[in-house]
Amino acid sequence: VFDDTRGNKKFKMDLEACVVLPDSRLVAFGSGSSPQREKIVTVAPGKGAMAQQMSGEDLYAGLRAHSDPRGARLNIEGAVVQGEWLRLLQRGNGKRGFEPWNAILDVALDKFLGWLDGRHPFPPVRRIFEVHLGALAGVPFGFTDAAVTDDGRVAFLACAEDTEDALIDGPVTGCRFGWLGADDPSVVVAPVVDGEGKPTHLKLEGIEARTGGGTMFDVVADMDRGDEPAQIAELAVRE
């Protein structure tokens, strides 16, 4: 566990974004919000597979070169494969009342695979879509994760966390679920509510689509406290 109480948070790799590649490899991306968090971990399929760590310095340098001209800190929170693209979700953090930089950074999947295997330099970002997620009580929403359903749609989570810094946790005022457009920045969002119909204040930071249906998901809540484990829950989308 990495937190301020233990004094070890600076060593946290912050593997916020995970994706399974077409060859069944699992790739976990550090958020890139600090040099320590510019690492990538891969796990090959098969029994007894070991996790391998590699530097992502050139990857994050390439992403940072395309980041927000307003100076927002790079903070990759989600990754999905959709068609020919590896899509990386940048989470915006900002002051109350200001629009944060939430964006989708698209990299050609075949070029990324070549880089991952050491055959090519890291490919440039080919498409960037800034996404406007709104705010709640003055606190802007920011991406926290994404997943692809069986029918190819990209679902995402966004939380309104009251903090101005990607390295500092803050209270959550609400969460939203949404669908992301394939070739444009359009989104369709809805508030996430609990079993009693009340808006959740949990920090939902993980989502995975269940096999066989595009409206049922598993989600993970990060409690941001070292003495309390993360929670896993079922999310049902009513369309």
Stretch-by-stretch model annotation:
Residues 1-239:
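Sequence/structural signature of beta-propeller domains
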